[in-house]
Amino acid sequence: MSARNETGYERVLVPVGDKSDPNMLTELSSILVDPRRGAVRFTHVTTDRSFVGSQENWRTGSDSVAESQHTLREEGIESTGTIRTASSALDGILEEAEEYEADAILIGWTDKDSVSSLVDKLLRKAGCDVIVFSADRDPIDTDSILVPVVVKPDANRLQMLAIMSQRTGASITFTYVTGDEGTDEEGRGLLDQSAERLAEYGVQAETELKSASSAVDALGQLSEDYDVMVIGTSRGWWLRKTLFGRKTDKIAQEAQCSLLMHKWQGEVPPES
């Protein structure tokens, strides 16, 4: 991520499949990359080493990469493309990220019924920010962003939120759901602190304190009024302990809007 007074990631890696971009990662990358000196690399990883399979994968992968590059070129954003053969999709993405010196990887969350094994391992092993996105609509058309908070927000996440808001004109609302694990006093303190810190990045946020017996149900209901919900991985890999798996999957199923999961580089989860 660029310095505070600058605007976006400098090197964004976007793995693409052999189909169209169902989660609109190309559009999301155009929002998050620094338009002045940033660049995006699209990569397609093939694991089929047979001649026929490899040829077909290279062809379809090349088409996907070229299509994404064309979209960004029309927006004046620098981009490159690669096709990589690796023992697994995970290895190929990690190798490409290291060679490219990516400061963020964007990957799609296609099946909202569960977090895939690939995404789980990528969140654990990538040495940069990882952004997992499930698109309900074009992210460029985002007007409102909902951000549930459970701990003091990290500077990396605040900067990403500020970039999204400034590029799209979207409003940001921090929300805290009180219930079994939190009190109104704790919630108000976190909400005020989150809004104050985001203001340091030039973005004013709204706050909402909600009381509910089920945070999952409450967030699902709240999400109906927003375009994107951003969840993170705080509290010492809190996402893995209380959201990742059951709760994350349930939140994804209940969400009535696009869902963005953000892991910043400094979050290092324990091994399973």
From Swiss-Prot:
Induction comment from the UniProt entry of this chain:
Up-regulated in response to K(+) limitation. Induced under desiccating conditions.
Decide whether keyword Disulfide bond is in the record. no
What phenotype has been reported when the gene encoding this protein is knocked out? Answer: kdpFABCQ deletion strains are only able to grow in the presence of K(+) concentrations above 60 uM.
Keywords linked to the UniProt accession: Plasmid, Stress response
Carries keyword Transcription?
Answer: no
Q: What does the similarity note say?
A: Belongs to the universal stress protein A family.
Main role?
Has probably an essential function in the transcriptional regulation of the kdpFABCQ operon.
- What is the protein name stated in its UniProt record? Probable Kdp system regulatory protein KdpQ
- Source organism per UniProt: Halobacterium salinarum (strain ATCC 29341 / DSM 671 / R1)
